Amino acid sequence: MRANAGRAPVFKPGELNVYSAPRDVGEVSRALRHTGRRVMLVPTMGALHEGHLALVRAAKRTPGAVVVVSIFVNPLQFGAGEDLDAYPRTLDQDLAKLRAEGVEIAFTPTAASMYPNGLRTTVQPGPMAAELEGGSRPTHFAGVLTVVLKLLQIVAPDRAFFGEKDYQQLVLIRQMVADLNVNVQVIGVPIVREHDGLAMSSRNRYLDPAQREAAIALSAALTAGAHAATAGVQAALDAARGVLEAVPGIVVDYVELRDGELGPVSPSGSGRLLVAVRFGTTRLLDNVAIEIESIAGTDGQPVGPDGRVQSPWRN
């Protein structure tokens, strides 16, 4: 059901209730919490795919959960020349998918209702926002964090769910929640992939058949980098970049290896390998957690913790 403007919002359990006014979804969320329900937020920009539905399913696994899925193409996070107007808007199909998943609340605001006073107040995301994605999209994360903070304030969820595909976004949201004392638990959900390994993304639909075939190089590069990490940080980076640069039509924006908080990576231990590439105007991201298990010995061969020479490739 859709809420009617000018009336108190109505919530029907077991149905998909659609609210466009921030005040309405906020009132319903507060009322449900008072009855003992636990409010779960899944922020999206629509064009829902299996990656989004994995977030929904993770949220629904919480005992007593009522899931709120927001669908809002946020203009603040699109820079000059980016694809705001072209971004897919498939609201009817999205709502049908949410009904099939048993979601009870969809929040579908307009830009006017989210930013009634324009851009008077925004979030400054800090220095990490200038790195990685921020290198080519300098205003992106200010827009992301502003809308996420507004959604958290409007819905006031117990937990909010974000995919690990946009890993830098996830880290910055966690920083914001900690630094601004926002009372919510941020849950990261693993990447969902197509049958051939390509990370699911709403932007995949922009790829032509040749680009779509070439795009599997992203996951192949991450796999190569993860295996090569037994020979150290530089070996992992070289292996990943080598896979990407061998594929015609790919423009590599970055290949980076960081720690789990996106700080400098240690010579051994856990890390996060991140890649970003472009096919024409379509930009794709991917990442994977890796273990850097050894360092190079004096002869250039990887040496494990026991001091023995190891092969840089393992199954």
UniProtKB/Swiss-Prot annotation:
**UniProt catalytic activity:** (R)-pantoate + beta-alanine + ATP = (R)-pantothenate + AMP + diphosphate + H(+)
Keyword flag Ligase? yes
| Pathway involvement of the protein, from the record | Cofactor biosynthesis; (R)-pantothenate biosynthesis; (R)-pantothenate from (R)-pantoate and beta-alanine: step 1/1
Q: Which EC class heads this enzyme's classification?
A: ligase
Subcellular locations according to the entry: Cytoplasm
Q: Which cellular components does GO assign to this protein?
A: cytosol
Which residues constitute the catalytic centre? H52
A GO molecular function annotation here is: pantoate-beta-alanine ligase activity
- Which positions are annotated as binding (R)-pantoate? Q77, Q169
Keywords tagged on the record: ATP-binding, Cytoplasm, Ligase, Nucleotide-binding, Pantothenate biosynthesis
Q: What is its EC number?
A: 6.3.2.1
**Which Pfam families does the annotation name?**
Pantoate_ligase
Subunit field text: Homodimer.
Function text = Catalyzes the condensation of pantoate with beta-alanine in an ATP-dependent reaction via a pantoyl-adenylate intermediate.
Q: Which NCBIfam families match?
A: panC
Task: List other remarks.
Answer: The reaction proceeds by a bi uni uni bi ping pong mechanism.
Q: What is this protein called?
A: Pantothenate synthetase
Q: Record the organism.
A: Mycobacterium ulcerans (strain Agy99)
